[in-house]
């Protein structure tokens, strides 16, 4: 399963990605809205974990 993690706090995003990686999920990270929008336009994901308070 390919997951996009959209989170502006890098430490939290890294922790989530590390945990999911141990569970054999393929994770990509986006730290800004623009980065997430670009990745969503290019790649396909099975799931998006979105920070609702993203600036």
Can you say where each PLM-predicted feature lies in the sequence?
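N-terminal/domain-start alpha-helical segments
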Residues: 1-55
């Amino acid at each position: 399963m390919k997951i996009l993690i959209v989170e502006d706090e890098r430490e939290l995003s890294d922790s989530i990605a590390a945990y999911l990686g141990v569970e054999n999920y393929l994770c990509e990270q986006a730290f800004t809205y623009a980065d997430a929008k670009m990745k969503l336009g290019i790649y396909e994901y099975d799931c998006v974990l979105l920070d609702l308070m993203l600036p």
